UniProtKB/Swiss-Prot annotation:
Subcellular localization: Nucleus
Species the sequence originates in: Arabidopsis thaliana
Described function: Putative transcription factor.
MF-aspect GO terms: DNA binding; DNA-binding transcription factor activity
GO process annotations (BP): embryo development ending in seed dormancy
Annotated ranges, domain RWP-RK: 130-216
Coiled coil spans: 190-224
Protein name: Protein RKD4
Keywords: Coiled coil, DNA-binding, Nucleus, Transcription, Transcription regulation
GO cellular component: nucleus
Chief location of this protein within or outside the cell: nucleus
Length: 256
């Protein structure tokens, strides 16, 4: 029952809408067209209007253009352009104003210097001092090399050459060079060490005569470092070496 009622209402509404549209005048609806804006001035007319404008200098009141304290004007001009051409500007800089340049400025009445300048001077002076120090050291080494004599060098024959150079306060190369100049081509440390060991061993066995001969031979090597060991000294050294070897071996056998 309710569905038939709704359908009848829809039919009446559709009929009413169709009758309303038939009675409307189609010509009564206005077209919504946007109006076209037309420019009333042509481009050429704009240029003509600019030509008709009065000169610019006639629009300005020259009485209002008054100079300030830093400018000096000459008011003898015939047109607006002459006004600006005849302006004289005072570019004088006061003496109490100091311009900044690439180099630091130091005032004459200032009692203190720039920290940067002091630092730079300190670095330069340090470099100079280092150069002078190195040069002095080289000169001292050269003088030290020239002053080395045989009497001073032979006191260090009983120790290695590197240790001797350190105690003599010279370089190893300097000491070797000076030794060659004095005729010392081989450092006699090993020879003297061998002789001292041999003398000690012979003293322990009571061979006083051989000890005396070895001491004389040691003195000879201290005077002539390139002198060779005698055949008798070499034989004694070999005999002592064999005796020490047998003694150590026997001690080792007793231990095991």
């Amino acid at each position: 029952m309710s569905s038939s009622k709704h359908s009848s209402v829809f039919n009446y509404s559709a009929l009413f809408l169709s009758l309303f549209l038939q009675q409307m005048d189609q010509n009564s609806l206005h077209h919504l067209d946007s109006p076209k804006i037309e420019n009333e001035y042509e481009p050429d007319s704009l240029y003509d209007m600019l030509d008709k404008l009065p000169p610019l200098d006639s629009l300005l009141d020259m009485e209002d253009l008054k100079p300030n304290a830093g400018l000096h004007f000459q008011f003898h001009y015939n047109s607006f352009e002459d006004f600006f051409e005849n302006i004289e500007v005072d570019n004088t800089i006061p003496s109490d104003i100091h311009l900044l340049t690439q180099e630091p400025y130091f005032s004459s009445d200032s009692s203190s210097s720039s920290p940067l300048a002091i630092q730079n001077d300190g670095l330069i002076s340090n470099v100079k001092v280092e150069k002078v120090t190195v040069k002095k050291k080289r000169n001292l080494k050269k003088k030290r090399q020239d002053k080395l004599e045989m009497s001073e060098i032979k006191q260090f024959f009983d120790r290695p050459i590197m240790k001797a150079a350190k105690e003599l306060n010279v370089g190893l190369t300097v000491l070797k060079k000076r030794c060659r100049e004095l005729g010392i081509y081989r450092w006699p440390h090993r020879k003297l060490k061998s002789l001292n060991s041999l003398i000690k061993n012979l003293k322990n066995v009571g061979m006083e005569e051989e000890v005396k001969n070895l001491e004389e031979h040691r003195f000879l090597i201290e005077q002539e470092p390139d002198a060779e060991l005698s055949d008798g000294t070499k034989k004694l050294r070999q005999a002592c070496f064999k005796a020490n070897y047998k003694r150590r071996k026997s001690l080792g056998d007793d231990y095991y």
